[in-house]
Amino acid sequence: MIELVFPDGSKREFPDGVTGREIAAGISKSLEKKAILVEVDGELLDLERPLEKGGAFKILTREAPEALETIRHDVSHILAEAVQELFPGTQVTIGPAIEDGFYYDFAREEPFSLDDLAKIEQRMKEIVDRDEPIRREEWDRDEAIRHFREIGEEYKAQIIEAIPAGEKITVYRQGQWKDLCRGPHLPSTRHAGKAFKLTKLAGAYWRGDHRNAQLQRIYGTAWASEADLEAYIQRLEEAEKRDHRKLGRQMDLFHMQEEGKGMVFWHEKGLTLWRTVESYVRRRLDEAGYQEVRTPQVLDRVFWEKSGHWDKYRPNMFVCETEEGEELSLKPMNCPGHVQIFKFGQKSYRDLPLRMAEFGACHRYEPSGALHGLMRVRAFTQDDAHIFCREDQIEEETARFIELANSIHADFGLERDHIALATRPEVRAGSDEFWDKAEAQMLAAARKAGVEPVIAEGDGAFYAPKLDWVLKDSIGRTWTCGTIQLDYVLPERLGAEYVAEDGSKQRPVMLHRAICGSLERFIGVLIENYAGAFPLWLAPVQVVVATITSDADDYARAAAAELKAKGLRVELDLRNEKINYKVREHSLAKVPVIAVVGRREAEEGKVALRRLGSDGQQILALGEAAEALAMEALPPDLARKRQDGGVQAGLGGEREAG
């Protein structure tokens, strides 16, 4: 007998080998019809699978959040069946569920087209209507390899050969079609529903290795209901409008090209945005007591061997050899260099905590298929810093950093979704006692800063736990930006020491921390969060002075000069074009303020201000407009310093500072 604990806390015993369907049927016929999976002790199982153990037990319907991943996995199998029906001879490889959807990789000489996707999607719906039963089978390893080779599925045979000896080989039959799979799966294709859509085609390499055969990947999305699917498609359409790669070109911020994969060509306006972000973060770090340093871009192999990166990170490093036989690498991380600066000269306990920051340029090899605009690059700059401290300072320093990171993210207009405490991974360094202590320190520090972190089991670095910031943008997407990680290992490896109060030599603890992470990625997030329509302080061009008639050219030049004198970033548009054309063009470039001047404005010493996204305009004296815009364009940290009695002037009169 096995004992199952139901969600209401009740316990019941069942004979060994009972299935989830039988249990559901014993509760009610309606539940049996709606049930698609069961969960036993945290493990999802097919409805028809005999239960081998007891524990916490749940019957899942398609509305259950836990069921969504299995629905997506089933739809990926339905995709594969549809492709093989429509395009005989196509080999299947792998087809997992992923965030928001699924994909399947196919081996086929002729490329799929967008027209093919529509045909495949229609066939998938027909397969759902067939209500094909889905059943799990355990196969003999050698028989499975032989069978898949006989039917021309070489990739499946290779997958089976790579499965560790002793692990069960399971095949799922879906009507007459079959696939190698661990499961679980739904009772039949009907249960997958039709709330799915194929979204795009892409290339992929077998086993993710560019030296292997190239495959064709079909992506799709699947949801529990049509309403959920429609909402997701709307989010996709909104995200497409905000795509930083498209806006980067449209706004003349940056571009990327084949000759420099994963490298960014920053244009003048993009670099202005970069410098604005960097300058703001630099001021905040300076206020928080950080020393800014700079470490070499290229260091000898011996250095990376000492730090441990050569053994653990070599495939991601860019390495070159000199004529003298030196093996050098571009730095993938800044931390070992910071330890060298810490070691220069004797350090005392009185010097701690020592906060060392660097806007450090790093290079890491990423496969070309993984690159994605500013979000995934090979050359990037981190707002990196390392805090060297005593063990008794960990909690205080971590709490201070949490407050700083929260403040900076808020100033950039990014809402915090949550902070995750990533705990010990399965493969890790250090004893359980060490991990107990380190996790408790991070948790206590978070709570000291007024934060209750979400526990991310097993997501910690191999050497220590960490806190990760998960931010939410204006359309509800989440981005991981910011981290703080404990490290006892690197100071030990590289021989960092300080003189303790009793005169003994001690190892400092090292806190790795970043607020933006990669500046490239952070700027990409900002572009998409604001859809390019930045607040005035971030906008690369804050004001364009545009003329209605050439009679106002001299006045426009004087107006632009006055605005620039107030520290504003200004462009002058004296072209012989209609004003509506100019306004439309600068609006597409997301310029937040257009100061329109014509003959009347020139005579009266005024400007007509048009805001991005607004049809109205505000007529102000030039001096008044310059003062108000300059105040509004102050970065948040400088605006706080300019507070006067809790209010500050703006174009809307008085407003709260902060």
From Swiss-Prot:
UniProt GO cellular component terms: cytosol
Pfam families xref list: HGTP_anticodon, TGS, tRNA-synt_2b, tRNA_SAD
MF annotations from Gene Ontology: ATP binding; metal ion binding; threonine-tRNA ligase activity; tRNA binding
Record PROSITE patterns: AA_TRNA_LIGASE_II, TGS
Subcellular localization(s) per the UniProt record: Cytoplasm
Domain of life per record: Bacteria
Enzyme class: ligase
SMART domains reported in the protein's UniProt record: tRNA_SAD (SM00863)
Entry binding sites for Zn(2+): C335, H386, H512
Gene3D superfamilies: 3.10.20.30, 3.30.54.20, Anticodon-binding domain (3.40.50.800), Bira Bifunctional Protein, Domain 2 (3.30.930.10), Threonyl-trna Synthetase, Chain A, domain 2 (3.30.980.10)
Domain TGS: 1-61
Region: Catalytic, residue numbers: 243-535
Reactions catalysed, as given in the entry: tRNA(Thr) + L-threonine + ATP = L-threonyl-tRNA(Thr) + AMP + diphosphate + H(+)
Keywords of the record: Aminoacyl-tRNA synthetase, ATP-binding, Cytoplasm, Ligase, Metal-binding, Nucleotide-binding, Protein biosynthesis, RNA-binding, tRNA-binding, Zinc
Biological process (GO), any one: threonyl-tRNA aminoacylation
Cofactor(s) this protein requires: Zn(2+)
Assembly and binders: Homodimer.
Role this protein plays: Catalyzes the attachment of threonine to tRNA(Thr) in a two-step reaction: L-threonine is first activated by ATP to form Thr-AMP and then transferred to the acceptor end of tRNA(Thr). Also edits incorrectly charged L-seryl-tRNA(Thr).
This protein's name: Threonine--tRNA ligase
Organism of provenance: Phenylobacterium zucineum (strain HLK1)
